[in-house]
Design a protein with these regions (language model features):
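Feature captures the catalytic cores and cofactor-binding loops of soluble hydro-lyases/lyases
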Residues: 119
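Active-site-adjacent structural elements in enzyme catalytic domains
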Residues: 122-129
Length: 374
């Protein structure tokens, strides 16, 4: 570029309208988007052959658990990018732990109740042990069998509720009994019953559980995802970059982005470490070993950064499980599945938000969209 062209370019730039300074936006409420975000109305993780899902939702207070059941087993992997996770058996799903051996998972548990809720995985183990004995009832002394049931938790204990009510082993067992291959209930059910978003600002919006699936053309490959969204951060529409839901103003009528508060250096209510998180499971019918599934889980976790901001915060315990049921034997590159897993998990996160139902004092996205904060 010569000097004349450069001067012309600079003159053109000078004629453009000035961009607003960050300081001009600080502390100003953000209006609700006029048009609700469009997310697929169909598709669930159960579209992956070999995957079933069951919920237990407690009717005494908002909490529960969700079981992703693999009756014939699935090769598992995991990624834990969150700062303060509450989980079970995630270490054995790391590639460095089992470099030469794949781990066969029979179920994954997503649960509320914080660490107390991990007890629900014991009920899932009991259910699977009983099914094992049913399959081997003709044998006088079946060999010992310990089902692998990884789990992750969200923090949904609130001082204004009886927080001693948490998912138990019986809750996990009932979720297994409810498991089906069909349509999966979304919103404030199972692990998403007590979920909320935008905690960092101190005045959150109700969230829940979402699921989605994606078929890769005519290849026969299916990728699915399910998640409970209880994020510290706000949720953004990836199509527009605009705030979708999250931290609200003190009067609760509008959203006030956490990032704007932080830019202003304003005091922000910091949640205690480990009190909030997004926990997820992605699955595919393509065949892979555990090392590849751990990489797929890691790639899928990119969905958090595309939709949640801030993501992977110190107060988050973000955990992503990945399962390969292996019913499709056609060779597929695992990087391609990881890329698609991130896309489908992004949709599941959005569905968790838009399908949530508000409760007194904590409106949902739909309540805010209609101008009816509770």
């Amino acid at each position: 570029m010569n000097r004349r062209q450069m001067l012309g370019t600079m003159a053109g730039l000078a004629a453009l309208p000035a961009l607003p300074r960050a300081s001009d936006l600080i502390g100003k409420p953000v209006a609700i988007e006029d048009d609700p975000i469009s997310v697929p109305s169909e598709g669930w993780i159960t579209d992956v052959d070999g995957i079933e899902v069951g919920h237990f939702t407690d009717d005494r207070r908002p909490t529960g658990c969700t079981v992703i059941l693999c009756r014939h087993g699935a090769i598992g992997g995991a990624d834990v990018p969150g700062g303060n996770p509450g989980s079970r058996l995630t270490d054995m799903l790391q590639p460095l732990r089992n470099a030469d051996e794949s781990v066969i998972v029979e179920a994954v548990v997503l649960t509320g109740g914080s660490d107390y809720g991990l007890a629900s995985a014991g009920g899932v183990e009991r259910y699977l042990r009983e099914r094992y004995f049913e399959r081997h009832k003709a044998e006088p002394h079946p060999k010992p069998h310990v089902p692998i049931v990884p789990a992750a938790v969200i923090f949904d204990l609130f001082a204004d509720q009886d927080w001693t009510i948490v998912p138990t082993a019986e809750s996990g067992y009932k979720a297994c009994e409810a498991a089906t291959k069909g349509k999966v209930a979304e919103g404030c059910v199972g692990a998403g019953a007590g979920a909320a978003i935008g905690h960092w600002g101190g005045n959150p919006t109700k969230s829940g559980l979402g699921t989605a699936s994606l078929k890769l053309g005519d290849t026969g490959v299916v990728v699915g995802a399910i998640c409970a969204v209880n994020a510290v951060g706000d949720i953004y529409n990836p199509n527009t970059g605009k705030l979708l839901a999250g931290s609200r103003t003190d009067d609760g009528k509008n959203f006030l982005p956490i990032l704007e508060r932080l830019r202003a250096g304003k005091e922000v209510v910091l949640p205690p470490p480990g009190t909030h998180t997004t926990i997820s499971c992605v699955a595919t019918n393509a065949s892979f070993e555990s090392a590849a599934m751990a990489k797929i889980a890691q790639m899928a976790s990119a969905a958090h950064a595309r939709v949640i901001n801030p993501s992977w915060a110190p107060g988050d315990g973000d955990t992503v499980f990945a399962l390969s049921t292996g019913t499709l034997k056609t060779p597929v590159e695992h990087g391609a599945i990881g890329a698609m897993a991130a896309e489908v998990l992004k949709e599941a996160i959005l569905r968790a938000v838009v399908n949530a139902t508000g409760r007194p004092g904590m409106p949902s996205y739909r309540d805010m969209l209609r101008g009816r904060p509770l």
